[in-house]
UniProtKB/Swiss-Prot annotation:
Name of the featured protein: Argininosuccinate lyase
Cellular component, GO annotation: cytosol
InterPro entries attached to this UniProt entry: Arg_succ_lyase_C (IPR029419), Argininosuccinate_lyase (IPR009049), Fumarase/histidase_N (IPR024083), Fumarate_lyase_CS (IPR020557), Fumarate_lyase_fam (IPR000362), Fumarate_lyase_N (IPR022761), L-Aspartase-like (IPR008948)
Subcellular locations according to the entry: Cytoplasm
GO MF, any single term: argininosuccinate lyase activity
Family, per entry: Belongs to the lyase 1 family. Argininosuccinate lyase subfamily.
Source species, domain of life: Bacteria
Lineage: Bacteria, Thermotogati, Thermotogota, Thermotogae, Petrotogales
Organism: Petrotoga mobilis (strain DSM 10674 / SJ95)
Gene that specifies this protein: argH
Length: 441
């Protein structure tokens, strides 16, 4: 069955028919196409375009189609053709009435919005699960000291929990972005027709409410040609993957023998086909790698849309693969990341030792001098020279004796050793959001 053809004298070429078909991709939208068709039939009944009896036939047939299983994907043009073809096979000419006051243009946009809305809720749930795991880990490793880094060089002492909670903030923003995007996803375009609306008295608001949409689109041309909601989702997904990738990069580094801060479980690691000793952090590496794939999907759709005149163009058929692939990739990465973190072990002692040998208390020594009345820039220079001296002696700053300190600055007294204590440094942090020692209450 074709949904078009009366105007044509010649049969479509076989290669063109295959080229034009999207059923292998958009079959995923089948349940949404059926639900949207049910709501559309309700709208046709309300407008007295079909009778109560005809509606009941259509409803019964659509619900039967929803329960059917396919051993292989039918050879039809697209998911809309499939549903209408099966409907006609079941109830004859009554089934042909389903497309009254509707175009595939508003139909596909509706299906995609319903699909994406559903998937966004699933992704939000996964992000919330991830944040629960991160918060639990931060409680477990509260006050476990580690180096904080800038330029991948040891910078200042922080706690492992504070580092984990940095990612909680990122994922909270991601959740907020997804929730906000639902305002633009959850808009019904049914009734926009091909591009100009319809002369049938369809109650668009009523049909939208049946499908759980919050509002209807206000311009029929925009309704069928808009794919901003997909581009926006792909942008948000790219940000989420960026956050996962940054964390994955750290886990790859931390799990190396050079760092040895963490060890991934056997469940989330793989081995080498040639080197028997290897334990590779492939879970983190694959997440890092798949980030580029999601970025590519965003760029793909942006490129597809950038030159399209209004309204619908067949180019827009290419929106589904980047959308579906991004949804699948993002969900599996989140699931694997959650499992990886849950089973990861942390080498607290190794982190603590890394703080000791890195002069991470140098900034606090400079602040100590400022409190003694020395301008910060001068204090910075004095401490820099002290660090250089300690490096030549191959000792931490806090192991210098007081006379050595006074060789660089007479303002340094015995209380400097309290200031240089890492735990005291963490306790001294006062600003909101600082990496500080958490006292037990």
């Amino acid at each position: 069955m074709k949904l078009w053809g009366g105007r044509f004298k010649e049969k479509i070429a076989e290669d063109m028919e295959i080229f034009n078909s999207s059923i292998n991709v958009d079959i995923r939208l089948l349940p949404y196409d059926i639900e949207a068709s049910l709501a559309h039939a309700e709208g046709l009944k309300k407008a007295k375009i079909i009778s109560e009896e005809e509606f009941e036939q259509i409803e019964r047939a659509l619900r039967e189609i929803k329960e059917e299983k396919f051993e292989e994907i039918p050879k039809v043009e697209d998911v809309h053709t499939l549903v209408e073809q099966m409907l006609v096979e079941k109830i004859g000419d009554v089934g042909k009435k389903i497309h009254t006051a509707r175009s595939r243009n508003d139909q596909i946009a509706t299906d995609e919005r319903m699909y994406l809305r559903n998937e966004i809720f699933k992704i939000i749930d996964l992000l919330e699960q991830l944040n629960v795991v991160l918060v639990e880990l931060s409680k477990k490793y509260k006050n476990k000291i580690m180096p904080g880094y800038t330029h991948m060089q040891r910078a200042q002492p922080i706690t492992f929990s504070h580092h984990l909670l940095a990612y909680v903030e990122m994922f909270k923003r991601d959740i907020d972005r997804l929730k906000d995007s639902l305002k633009r996803v959850n808009v019904s375009v049914l009734g926009s027709g091909a591009l100009a609306g319809t002369s049938y008295d369809i109650d668009r608001t009523y049909v939208a409410s049946l499908l759980g949409f919050n509002e209807v689109s206000l311009n029929s041309i925009d309704g069928v040609s808009d794919r901003d909601f997909i581009v926006e989702f792909l942008s948000i997904a790219s940000l989420i993957m960026m956050h996962l990738s940054r964390f994955s990069e750290e886990i790859v580094l931390w799990s190396s023998q050079e760092f040895n801060f963490v060890e991934l479980s056997d469940e989330y690691s793989t081995g080498s086909s040639i080197m028997p000793q290897k334990k590779n952090p492939d879970s983190a590496e694959l997440i890092r790698g798949k980030t580029g794939r999601v970025y590519g999907n965003l760029l793909s759709l942006l490129t597809t849309m950038k030159g399209l005149p209004l309204a619908y163009n067949k180019d827009m058929q290419e929106d589904k693969e980047p959308l579906f692939d991004t949804v699948d990739t993002l969900k599996v990465c989140l699931k694997v990341f959650i499992g990886m973190l849950k089973t990861m072990s942390v080498n607290e002692e190794k982190m603590k030792q890394a703080v000791k040998f890195g002069y991470l208390n140098a900034t606090d020594l400079a602040d100590y001098l400022v409190k003694k009345g020395i301008p910060f820039r001068n204090a910075h220079d004095i401490v820099g020279k002290l660090v250089a001296y300690a490096i030549t002696k191959k000792v931490p700053i806090e192991e210098l004796n007081i006379s050595e300190f006074k060789n660089f600055c007479q303002s340094i007294d015995e209380d400097v050793y309290e200031v240089l204590n890492i735990k005291n440094i963490l306790k001294s942090r006062k600003t909101i959001g600082a990496a500080r020692w958490e006292e037990d209450v």
